[in-house]
Curated annotation (Swiss-Prot):
Tissue note: Ubiquitous. Highly expressed in liver, spleen, lung, duodenum, stomach, adrenal gland, pituitary, testis, corpus luteum, uterus and fetal ovary.
UniProt modified residues of type N6-succinyllysine: 165
Main location: endoplasmic reticulum
Domain LDL-receptor class A, residue spans: 36-70, 71-112
Annotated source species: Bos taurus
Binding residues for substrate: 48, 52
InterPro entries: EF_Hand_1_Ca_BS, EF_hand_dom, Gtb1-like, LDL_receptor-like_sf, Man6P_isomerase_rcpt-bd_dom_sf, MRH_dom, PRKCSH, PRKCSH_N
Pathway(s) the chain acts in: Glycan metabolism; N-glycan metabolism
SUPFAM superfamilies: LDL receptor-like module (SSF57424), Mannose 6-phosphate receptor domain (SSF50911)
Keywords: Calcium, Disulfide bond, Endoplasmic reticulum, Glycoprotein, Hydrolase, Metal-binding, Phosphoprotein, Repeat, Signal
Residues carrying sugar: 71, 481
Encoding gene, per UniProt annotation: PRKCSH
GO cellular component: glucosidase II complex; intracellular membrane-bounded organelle
Disordered: annotated span: 284-363
Protein name: Glucosidase 2 subunit beta
């Protein structure tokens, strides 16, 4: 259309007599047979005062062809190019402002008429733009047809998935029931296996405790009369109960339940549990009789002298606030080393049996393992079906979203939905994924920064689909969240052409796409080369 408008003046323009600097559209105001009325109506003057180099009208309309009025306008006819208004102050200023040179009629300089050359270049540009529009619109129609077909296919696929979903849901429920049925004997067999193992552990532990108690009884029974007396018990001051470092006769008698002595059976039942953790053997632990192999059986702990009560949490916090970590470590070591004045030297650290295979639960028997394998197979089938159902539900959601999305009046922008486009500048790589997000990352590497996620179409009311808005990107330091407006321009290819930041944290991106090409106007043939000017 612009090309036609440019060509029409060349074909049909006729010379109309008018004062210098007056346009064809205003020539009827300048009738030399009548007085001239200022265009703003401020005054009327004789016509011979028009262009007399003296400003009579407030709006400068009486001096369109001179520089007398600072607010006047001079019209450049520019035949062969585009007409132009310039300020009257530029008339005869020694600078060629009109391509036809008519503004310098009395300045003494000669202006070359460049209008035809400019018109030729302008027409070439307009022709190229028209070609881009025609080709882009042709591609746009293909995109529209492609989306119609793709949309129909997606709708069919959606119907198939929705039908398949019901079948898969039923399958999942069947497999869930089979899994639960298979897990019942599995759990029962595993519980029985664990219970038998724990019972064996308890028996082994009881046996070991009796052996330890018997060994301690033999050590305490100095006269080997088959009983432990108060005096024999007093030979072990570590059994002190009042913290004075010695086991008094009364304390020993209390430990023996008020009796003067006690045989081995009563010693295990009544005394051993009370002294077990304090008692220190008089022989090395290696001289104990070896324990029978049993799971989860540990060597008895050797007795240690009484330790001071550990500090409370509040005391610990106070110490942390007042002292350094190194001081606390030293205090802990000191507190562990404190002993009553009359206490015997500290005993070696208690030794425990090293972990062995017997300490671990034994492998499942063949029948239990068979139950486990069957249940695991049922679980695997159920989980696989459940994953398939979740994948199908995700596919259904994606299809529903894509089918219902607003891709333009005829779906011409749908092809952008699954694409991303990049623009590399000196500092950043900008990435646009239409209908999803915009981001930037440093060219030399680094994490991407979100410039916004899809918000809405953002063009004016008469051209809604000419711009996109992406919002709620990464927040700027002490500023708003980043956002991006994407202007859609007509082009034969889809490419990001520019990215700028006109306002802080607000970006402007331009995307060329055939989908933005308008329908070109019909082409009217131009008959011959009738340039009457």
């Amino acid at each position: 259309m612009l090309l036609l408008l440019l060509l029409l003046p060349m074909c049909w323009a006729v010379e109309v007599r008018r004062p210098r600097g007056v346009s064809l559209t205003n020539h009827h105001f300048y009738d030399e047979s009548k007085p001239f009325t200022c265009l703003d109506g401020s005054a009327s003057i004789p016509f011979d005062q028009v262009n007399d180099d003296y400003c009579d009208c407030k709006d400068g309309s009486d001096e369109p062809g001179t520089a007398a009025c600072p607010n006047g306008s001079f019209h450049c006819t520019n035949t062969g190019y585009k007409a132009l208004y310039i300020s009257s102050r530029w008339v005869n200023d020694g600078v060629c402002d009109c391509c036809d040179g008519t503004d310098e009629y009395n300045s003494g300089i000669v202006c070359e008429n460049t209008c035809k050359e400019k018109g030729r270049k302008e027409r070439e540009t307009l022709q190229q733009m028209a070609e881009v529009t025609r080709e882009g619109f042709r591609l746009k129609k293909i995109l529209i047809e492609d989306w119609k077909k793709a949309r129909e296919e997606k709708q069919k696929k959606l119907i198939e998935l929705q039908a398949g979903k019901k079948s898969l849901e039923d399958q999942v429920e069947v497999l869930r029931t089979l899994k639960e049925e298979a897990e019942k004997p599995e759990e029962a067999a595993k519980d029985q296996h664990r219970r038998l193992w724990e019972e064996q552990q308890a028996i082994s532990k009881e046996q070991r405790e009796r052996e330890l108690a018997a060994s301690a009884f033999q050590e305490l029974d100095d006269d080997m009369d088959g009983a432990v007396s108060v005096a024999e018990l007093q030979t072990h001051p570590e059994l002190d109960t009042d913290g004075d470092g010695a086991l008094s006769e009364g304390e020993a008698q209390t430990l023996l339940g008020g009796d003067a002595q006690m045989d081995a059976a009563f010693f295990y039942d009544r005394v051993w549990a009370a002294i077990r953790d304090k008692y220190r053997s008089e022989v090395l632990p290696t001289e104990y009789p070896p324990s029978p192999p049993a799971p989860d059986v540990m060597e008895p702990k050797e007795e240690q002298p009484p330790m001071p009560s550990p500090p409370t949490e509040e005391e610990d916090e106070d110490e942390e606030d007042e002292e350094t970590e190194e001081d606390e470590d030293e205090e802990d070591e000191d507190s562990q080393g404190e002993q009553p004045k009359d206490a015997p030297p500290p005993a070696p650290a208690p030794q425990t049996a090293s972990p062995t295979e017997e300490d671990r639960m034994p492998p499942y028997d063949e029948q239990t393992q068979a139950f486990i394998n069957a249940a695991q197979e049922a679980r695997n089938k159920f989980e696989e079906a459940e994953r398939s159902l979740k994948d199908m539900e995700e596919s259904i959601r994606n299809l529903e979203q894509e089918i219902s999305f607003d891709f333009g009046p005829n779906g011409e922008f749908a092809y952008l939905y699954s694409q991303c486009y990049e623009l590399t500048t000196n500092e950043y790589v900008y990435r646009l994924c239409p209908f999803k997000l915009v981001s930037q990352k440093p060219k030399l590497g680094g994490s991407p920064t979100s410039l916004g996620t899809w918000g809405s179409w953002a063009g004016p009311d008469h051209d809604k689909f000419s711009a996109m808005k992406y919002e709620q990107g990464t927040g700027c330091w002490q500023g708003p969240n980043r956002s991006t407006t994407v202007r859609l321009l007509c082009g034969k290819e889809t490419v990001v052409t520019s990215t700028t930041e006109p306002s802080r944290c607000e970006y402007l991106m331009e995307l060329m796409t055939p989908a933005a090409c308008p329908e070109p106007p019909p082409e009217y043939p131009v008959e011959g080369d009738h340039d009457e000017l």
